[in-house]
Amino acid sequence: MAHPSQLGFQDAASPVMEELIHFHDHTLMIVFLISTLVLYIITAMVSTKLTNKYILDSQEIEIVWTILPAIILIMIALPSLRILYLMDEINDPHLTIKAMGHQWYWSYEYTDYEDLGFDSYMIQTQDLTPGQFRLLETDHRMVVPMESPIRVLVSAEDVLHAWAVPALGVKMDAVPGRLNQTAFIISRPGVYYGQCSEICGANHSFMPIVVEAVPLEHFETWSSLMLEEA
């Protein structure tokens, strides 16, 4: 969950998000070191009174500023490619959910069950109860079991949408007529909030996403109740 005036990422709730945060810190440190070096060189050049008018070229300097950036780019690219493949890998999901974007709500269908599906609308401000978050709460949450591979099939009924939950490190475009997929494993129980992340019309800001992760036995109880109500 995000906090007021927060500058960093939300707490990671999935292994992929933990990897993304580590990669961000790794890249940020490289950028910080390069910026410090450049600032030092500029300061030294501006403050010194020494000049050397006899150096017209330097083979050694050209070798260094060619090889060093290449090494730095490799140090960034290798972990980046690793995470890219991790995010795209979907092996033996325990549960598949189809998320459909509409103007302006989400509908969910649990494809492993025959009649388990529902629409998820934002709760209006006047209907909120104490402790609920404005513009983030929905009347039906997407409930999933924790510590289980979950596959989400994402599409849209009308215009472009995007299904995104920052704490899980997930963002997938919802394109009409096209079925995209993403996957995640939630590490701990909790309620995780997201929003449509593709401008989709007048009420784009009012189609939140709420994912609730519960132990497997609680999920089975919830799914049984939902099937009875269907």
From Swiss-Prot:
Primary location recorded for the protein, binned into one broad class: mitochondrion
One Gene Ontology term from the biological process aspect of the record: ATP synthesis coupled electron transport
GO CC, alphabetical: mitochondrial inner membrane; respiratory chain complex IV
Mitochondrial matrix face residues: 46-59
Subcellular location(s) of the protein: Mitochondrion inner membrane
Family annotation (Pfam families): COX2 (PF00116), COX2_TM (PF02790)
InterPro entries: CcO_II (IPR045187), CcO_II-like_C (IPR002429), CcO_II_C (IPR034210), Copper_CuA (IPR001505), Cupredoxin (IPR008972), Cyt_c_oxidase_su2 (IPR014222), Cyt_c_oxidase_su2_TM_dom (IPR011759), Cyt_c_oxidase_su2_TM_sf (IPR036257)
Spans within the Mitochondrial intermembrane topological domain: 1-14, 88-230
GO MF annotation list: copper ion binding; cytochrome-c oxidase activity
Cofactor needs: Cu cation
Bilayer topology term: Multi-pass membrane protein
Binding site residues for Mg(2+): 198
Highest taxon above the source species: Eukaryota
UniProtKB keywords: Copper, Electron transport, Magnesium, Membrane, Metal-binding, Mitochondrion, Mitochondrion inner membrane, Respiratory chain, Translocase, Transmembrane, Transmembrane helix, Transport
Catalytic activity of the protein: 4 Fe(II)-[cytochrome c] + O2 + 8 H(+)(in) = 4 Fe(III)-[cytochrome c] + 2 H2O + 4 H(+)(out)
Binding site for Cu cation A2: 196, 198, 200, 204
Chain positions recorded as Cu cation A1 binding sites: 161, 196, 200, 207
The protein's Enzyme Commission number: 7.1.1.9
Role of this protein: Component of the cytochrome c oxidase, the last enzyme in the mitochondrial electron transport chain which drives oxidative phosphorylation. The respiratory chain contains 3 multisubunit complexes succinate dehydrogenase (complex II, CII), ubiquinol-cytochrome c oxidoreductase (cytochrome b-c1 complex, complex III, CIII) and cytochrome c oxidase (complex IV, CIV), that cooperate to transfer electrons derived from NADH and succinate to molecular oxygen, creating an electrochemical gradient over the inner membrane that drives transmembrane transport and the ATP synthase.
NCBIfam families assigned: CoxB
Subunit structure: Component of the cytochrome c oxidase (complex IV, CIV), a multisubunit enzyme composed of 14 subunits. The complex is composed of a catalytic core of 3 subunits MT-CO1, MT-CO2 and MT-CO3, encoded in the mitochondrial DNA, and 11 supernumerary subunits COX4I, COX5A, COX5B, COX6A, COX6B, COX6C, COX7A, COX7B, COX7C, COX8 and NDUFA4, which are encoded in the nuclear genome.
Annotated family: Belongs to the cytochrome c oxidase subunit 2 family.
Name of the featured protein: Cytochrome c oxidase subunit 2
Organism the protein comes from: Scyliorhinus canicula
GN (gene name): MT-CO2
